Structures are given as C-alpha cells and as structure tokens.
Amino acid sequence: DITFAGVQRALPNAPDGYVPTSVSCPASRPTVRSAAKLSTNETSWLEVRRGKTLSALKDFFGHVKVGDYDVGAYLDKHSGNSSSLPNIGIAVSGGGWRALMNGAGAVKAFDSRTDNATATGHLGGLLQSATYISGLSGGSWLLGSIYINNFTTVDKLQTHEAGSVWQFGNSIIEGPDAGGIQLLDSAGYYKDLADAVDGKKKAGFDTTLTDIWGRALSYQMFNASNGGLSYTWSSIADTPEFQDGDYPMPFVVADGRNPGELVIGSNSTVYEFNPWEFGTFDPTIFGFVPLEYLGSKFEGGSLPSNESCIRGFDSAGFVIGTSSSLFNQFLLQINTTSLPSFIKDVFNGILFDLDKSQNDIASYDPNPFYKYNEHSSPYAAQKLLDVVDGGEDGQNVPLHPLIQPERHVDVIFAVDSSADTDYFWPNGTSLVATYERSLNSSGIANGTAFPAVPDQNTFINLGLSTRPSFFGCDSSNQTGPSPLVVYIPNAPYSYHSNISTFQLSTDDAERDNIILNGYEVATMANSTLDDNWTACVACAILSRSFERTGTTLPDICSQCFDRYCWNGTVNSTRPESYDPAFYLADNSMASVSLPTMLSTVVAAGLAMLILV
C-alpha cells in the first residue's frame, strides 16, 4: 500500500514509533559541531544539487523569457563554476491553515509538475531550480506534507477522498474520517494521541502539549495510518531522491525561549531543522547536533562513553508541531467554554501530568547543547531546551536559514501569509523584524545582512502589501552580502484568502479556492496583470549572478526594477484600516470580515480539544 490517492510516503525509520529509543551508536559517535561552516553532509549534497538546479534553470528559462536575451547561453557559459550561477531560496510563512494553503498555491505555481505551469506567463520550474526552501508554523506543515510524502505535488495533496491527507473539513478536534487509510474513529484517534505521548513520557522524556499537537497534525499532513507514527524528519536525508539532489533542501524554523523568560524577543535564538541537523548559527549556541540522534545525552558537545545513542526523537510531527507551538496556547482554554463536561474531563485527564509551566513550548529533553560553549551560551547550563513557534519573535517568514552567508543565496521568494492587520492580511511586519534583527546591537545576527525595508505603514501606503515587491535590488547599497528578496504577500485576487489563523476546518472548495488564489498571487494571475511579470522574476533570479560575472542586465530588467524594487520612499502616515479590493472576479461566497470576540473565543475553545 505504498500509495493512496497518488501520494507516496517517505521512510518510517523510528525504532519504536513515537518513543525515542536506545540504539547502538555508530563507530564514529555523534558530536555537536561548530556552526562556523556548513556541514559536510550539506556541502556534499550541494555538489550534486547545484548540477540539478542548472538543468532546471535551463528548462525554466525555456519558457520564461528575458526579452531577447539568451539566458541559456549565459548559463552554458558559466556552467563550469556553480558559484557563478543563480542560487535560489523559497520561504513560506506561518499563519495556520491559511499559510499552508496560500503557500501551497505559490509552491504549486513554482512546480513544473503542475499542469500548465510551464506555459507562457507561468512560473513552473522555479521550485526545481531552487536550492533551499524553508517553512515555519503553517508553512512547516506544507513542507512536512510535501517532503514526508516523498516530495509529492500540491495537486496530489488536494485530495477529495475521505480519510486522506488535507481533508481539512474534519478539524483536528474531530480527527480524520474513518475512510481511506485511517481505520480509527474519533475515540480511537484521541486514544492514539494520548498513548503515543504517554509512551514517550514513560521512556523518561519530558512531554508537553506540543507532543500531542504534533501527533494530531500528523493525521492531516502525512499519508500513513495512525498519523505516520514512525516517520522522522531525518528520514528525508535517507530518501534516494533527496540524496540524488532531485529537490531542494527543506528547513523548518523554530525559536528559542531564553532561560527565565516568557516573552520571545527580537534577540531570541532562531533554530533550524534540516534533514541532517538541528541547531543555529546564532552566537547564543553557534552549533549543530545530528538530528537523527536528538534525545541522546550530549554533554559539552560530545556523547559520554557511558551514554547510549537515542533515535526516534525527531518525529516529523513533533518537528512541525514545535514550529507551530503557538497553537498550544489555544489548547488551554477548554474549561472556559460551554463544551460538555465529559469532554473537559477527558481532556484534563490527559493534561494532568504535563508540566503546566511549559504549555506554550516544546521540550527538547535532554538539551543537546548542555555545557556546550559554556563561556558564551545562556543555554549551556540548561538540562532542557525550550523551543517555541518560529514566528513568535515577529519573523513570521522563515528567512533566517536563507540569509546565512555560508549558503550564498542570491534571491529569496518570500511568501507571506501573515495576519498582521485587523483583516488578517500581511503588512511587511516579518520583513521589518528580520531587517531590525540584522541591525541589533546585541550581535544576535552574527554577521547576517538583510536588505533595508520600510515601516509597516509604508508597506500599506505604497501598495507594497498588495502586489509582489523587490527589496535589495542594489547590492552596492547593502551593509553586507545579502540576497534580493521577492516579497509575495497574500492578497485577494479571486478569493478572500484571509481566513483566521485559528480557523480549524476548511471544506475542499474553500481549500482549493485559497490554493488557487495563492497561485494567482505568485504569478500575478498568470501574468495577466503584468505581461512582463515572469521576465521580472527572471531578472530577480539573475541579478546577483550577473553582478558576480560582470554581465550587464538586459534593458527589460531595468524596467522591471523600476517597477518592482522599493526605491527608498517612505510614507509612515497611519493608514485607514487595510481591506484590499479584489484584483480579479470574486469567487468567495461572502467577504471575510473582522471576527467578533465571540467567534474568536469559540474558535480558541474548540482548538483546545485537540488534546482530548
């Protein structure tokens, strides 16, 4: 039963389901490494992947033209030096199911496997041309669905069969339909959630609400019975297609909570999960641990000889649950709702033994960075590592892995589904947060640079939140090497895609409409709103590469940059409430408006039931 509804699964390689388990250590025992450079795994993989991206770029520029300029000849000329060629990253923001679906629309638009995506006016092949892709919170759910299901397509995830993935009409509260690959009813679903987490706790590991949240997410995101109990994030590195460099390297992003603090600030540590490692380039830790052996008792960067290797801690559901742990807070208000008392009793029984001080975090027990970099790390004395939702520091677009100087990313396509405004539209807050962090006097940015962006009011007043915009076009005006950022904010092209972050259920029609709207946002309605849009995307991709090779940009690129690059103009006047009009025909049944306090409380109360 390898496939269901056309969706393949990855590797269920955890030794004992959700329970982290002692295994024999490899001959070379795992250690924590310095973040001074990329891992040998990543550099070796890049040698393979960059060759694949060259081929993909040639295909992409076969249907995306840059005026009369022969991009294919340019790529051939520099094919012997991969560092001269464009290096592309894609970032998909958080924002719950809204972010998953809007981000899915962009990824669908970028995927050459999507029907008609390589036609004139479309952007199919950009995904295949990318080296890296990152997601946090709702964006991490999208990445998890795609990668754990063997780099499947968004089309195949848009299922219509009961019990299949992405059947969001059944909320996480209800659990999956008993049809299809799932064989359990709601009662069995709740029991499975509790049993999995209880097994981890009995094995001696700290557990929090994030464990149950991550297990619940797995039923919606992974095409496997019982929510893919044995699927790990590190298993991505073991899939032959990834090893062959056939698709981009995925990152899930989360934040650290500083010891003794509850508020996540701009100087918080930003972690990444990649297929091989967990860690950060930030100076607070500046280290990475082998992801496969999370849960092992590292001390001072090594594993003592009397300690076993642990595997299975990096459950794929736990990883994407960690990145979206903000939702934990909405699981705690059940007793303020009018839900039946027997439901509250069951829920509270599950929560009874969980640490009440850690309701909003994921507990990484033991801390893999215990006594590591003791002279500089505030986490070195902590036996447990508190990790939280990747957007809690305001950086809701996961740019951090993509702006690391060692990765040399030229251009980032930043898909922003944030709910910054009263009506749940983005206003650039995430980009502002990343820019301000790069200037933070604490040194937390650790040498990363980011192009200048304006304040949030300017984003709205200049229309930078209603259409794609470019930042960092003039690299000579940067504080350090930084990528050009193509900002793609969620906007209403044909559907009100601004559903609440905490809307827990979405029927297939709304799901598909939001995905279609996201496709239209990324392609500017298949270039019907700008005949030169795909050429302008191409110019953004080529810009840094042309600079390195001393190549003059074609005239059309100058026109594109005049049109899409922020020119430094600021208008900080406080705007009226931001409620953008449709670009295309309205396919919505009704406009999405500001929710009432009652509806927000009801949604929050329902979310609590995820842990029943």
From Swiss-Prot:
Modification(s) after translation: N-glycosylated.
Keywords of the record: Disulfide bond, Glycoprotein, Hydrolase, Lipid degradation, Lipid metabolism, Secreted, Signal
Location in the cell: Secreted
CDD domains: cPLA2_Fungal_PLB
UniProt-listed Gene3D superfamilies: Cytosolic phospholipase A2 catalytic domain
Glycosites: 41, 81, 116, 150, 223, 267, 306, 335, 427, 440, 446, 477, 498, 526, 532, 567, 571
Taxonomy, superkingdom: Eukaryota
Main location per the UniProt record: secreted
Gene Ontology terms, MF aspect: lysophospholipase activity; phospholipase A2 activity
Pfam families the record matches: PLA2_B
Keyword Cell division appears in the UniProt entry: no
Residue ranges occupied by any PLA2c domain in the UniProt entry: 24-571
Major enzyme class: hydrolase
Transmembrane segments: none
Signal peptide: 1-9
GO biological process: glycerophospholipid catabolic process
A cellular-component GO term for this protein: endoplasmic reticulum
Enzyme Commission number(s) of this protein: 3.1.1.5
Catalysed reaction equations from the record: a 1-acyl-sn-glycero-3-phosphocholine + H2O = sn-glycerol 3-phosphocholine + a fatty acid + H(+)
The family this protein is said to belong to: Belongs to the lysophospholipase family.
PANTHER family, A to Z: CYTOSOLIC PHOSPHOLIPASE A2, LYSOPHOSPHOLIPASE
Its biological purpose: Catalyzes the release of fatty acids from lysophospholipids.
Name by which UniProt lists this protein: Lysophospholipase
Species name: Penicillium chrysogenum (Penicillium notatum)
Organism classification: Eukaryota, Fungi, Dikarya, Ascomycota, Pezizomycotina
